């Protein structure tokens, strides 16, 4: 959202550049909102402007096509990967997430649930993913594919719990709720 207009666009780009130069891990979710942009073309260009600085990226299937011009989200994920990120997660709503690195590509299925409101599902997924990612206390390059898949499973669990309730923020589950859900579902 901060890439939609100046001065936040320049500030975001500069912050990402400085963070990258300092060795920080850069996570990116373009969070495309059509009404905030003058055109779809401007949105695509603006959102693509920071991809080369990104280490881990989450996009929806729609965003992946918009940012790359590809016709499938699988091809789009590979094109995004070629632009800089080391890991791309393409969220697919109730179908789960496609997780792609240079060495791996795997569909991580969603947990089946009765969706009441999908507001916040993508943000919840990414928050859950990043929370699990950070819990490993490892550099991205040191993580195994199974650990990265576990991050996606956790993200899917958070999103699954989120869509069961109304409202984006009130529906976000606690860490204890997520862990209990994972324990009961995966046990």
Where in this protein do the model-derived segments appear?
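Conserved beta-alpha-beta core of the PfkB/ribokinase-like small-molecule kinase fold
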Residues: 2-79, 85-86, 95-96
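Conserved phosphate-binding/catalytic region of the ribokinase-like
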Residues: 17-21, 69-187
